Amino acid sequence: MEDTSRCIDDVLKIGQQEKEIRQAEFSDAQGEREEVKCIDYTVDLEAGLPRHESSGKSNTLKQCYNAVLGFLEELIIVIIIVLLLYSLTMVGLFYVMTMTKFLF
């Protein structure tokens, strides 16, 4: 009998949670992003991340660290691309110089 009442309570809780989810409030924060609030859990719809990992303006040390690492990764990629283009240009110039030397 206790198991049956527990199951009924669980089903009622799940039903209540589904009802609260259906009645989620959409709010527009300064016209920049939308958030869904439901059962003390907020999701940033723009980024699809939970609030504590949201793309909002939160100055935590971890976010600053991640931003710096991201910047360094992008910088390294740009430097590698520039060096590849430079080396290809130098190889091309060397080829043109040697060909003109042989032809003329």
Curated annotation (Swiss-Prot):
Signal peptide: none annotated. Induction: Regulated by phosphate levels. One of its GO terms (cellular component) is fungal-type vacuole. It comes from the Eukaryota. Keywords: Membrane, Transmembrane, Transmembrane helix, Vacuole. The chain crosses the membrane at residues 76-96. GO terms for biological process: phosphate ion transport. This is Phosphate metabolism protein 6. It comes from Saccharomyces cerevisiae (strain ATCC 204508 / S288c).
